[in-house]
Amino acid sequence: MKNVLSIQSHVIYGHAGNSAAVFPMQRLGVNVWPLNTVQLSNHMQYGHWAGSAIDAAKMEQLVDGIAAIGALKRCDAVLSGFLGSPAQARAAVEIVRTVKATNPNAWYFCDPAMGQTGGIRPEPGVEEFIVAELPELADGMAPNHSELQKLAGQRIETVAEAVAACRSIIRRSPQVILVKHLHDRNSPADRFNMLVVTETEAWIGQRPLYAFPRHPVGVGDLTSAIFVARRLRGDSVRAAFEHTLAAVHAVVKATYDARRYELELVAAQDEIARPSEWFGAWVTGAD
């Protein structure tokens, strides 16, 4: 069984960060080692919360503890999400380097949370660090539309521009870019676009866009988690993308139908593993 070290925020109540990522990856047959960068009572969109961030040095100490018992060599991948400070971002880099030094076959997938995530905004300097440092280290990245623009340093309005932006990042090191949400001026307003790009291929997929009165938090974290889990299970990029598109839709639809604010992960767990509605992905020739 594959093992992934997941470095993200955590909420006790609800689903955001690791609270949105751990269970879906486990449901897909992957062992998850959660390292929580932030421990909160709930996500901040509620307007009231309690909690704090973990000290960056403690992040490295925790991973050193795993290494001390000889288990770090069994880590197959690292997934990072919300990093609250430049110090946490630097610690994440050192952790990835340690994992890769211990297991040269391990890979790193970066969800570059640069904006407000669940109401949490990173400290000044995090965005600049992510843009400057993480693409050279990552084997894959999962930006949303805004984050893709920041990573590529350009405005993006079409699929063609998005593919070109992804390829510019791939030239820095990552082998795959998953765009979790792509705004395309040519797409219908009631569709949610996702895109995945490699050096030589690109696929786009669409699912229905639901009009929530309050949009649930954690959808992006869920998206990255499912994609990583499917890749760890041996899926091709396209197969992992199509499964992710279908499974995330199933969770979002279950949440919408139940009129909930928090993602219905447990209720939709069978759909995460075996989605009943598939949307497929088609090759985009945009260069």
UniProtKB/Swiss-Prot annotation:
Pfam families registered for this protein in UniProt? Phos_pyr_kin
* Alphabetical list of InterPro entries matching this protein: PM/HMP-P_kinase-1, PyrdxlKinase, Pyridoxal_kinase_PdxY, Ribokinase-like
Keyword check for Membrane: no
- What's any GO biological process attached to this entry? pyridoxal 5'-phosphate salvage
Q: Name one GO cellular component term.
A: cytosol
Q: Which GO terms describe its molecular function?
A: ATP binding; magnesium ion binding; pyridoxal kinase activity
Q: What class of enzyme is it?
A: transferase
Q: Which residues bind ATP?
A: D111, A142, E147, K180
- What does the record give as its pathway? Cofactor metabolism; pyridoxal 5'-phosphate salvage; pyridoxal 5'-phosphate from pyridoxal: step 1/1
Q: Which SUPFAM superfamilies match?
A: Ribokinase-like
Q: Where does substrate bind?
A: S9, M44, Q45, D221
Query: Which superkingdom does the taxonomy of this entry point to?
Result: Bacteria
Q: Which reaction does it catalyse?
A: pyridoxal + ATP = pyridoxal 5'-phosphate + ADP + H(+)
Q: Which cofactor does it need?
A: Mg(2+)
- Alphabetical keyword list: ATP-binding, Kinase, Magnesium, Nucleotide-binding, Transferase
Enzyme Commission designation: 2.7.1.35
Please give the function described in this protein's UniProt entry.
Pyridoxal kinase involved in the salvage pathway of pyridoxal 5'-phosphate (PLP). Catalyzes the phosphorylation of pyridoxal to PLP.
Self-association and partners: Homodimer.
Please state which protein family the record places this protein in. Belongs to the pyridoxine kinase family. PdxY subfamily.
Supply the name of the protein. Answer: Pyridoxal kinase PdxY
Species per Swiss-Prot/TrEMBL record: Burkholderia mallei (strain ATCC 23344)
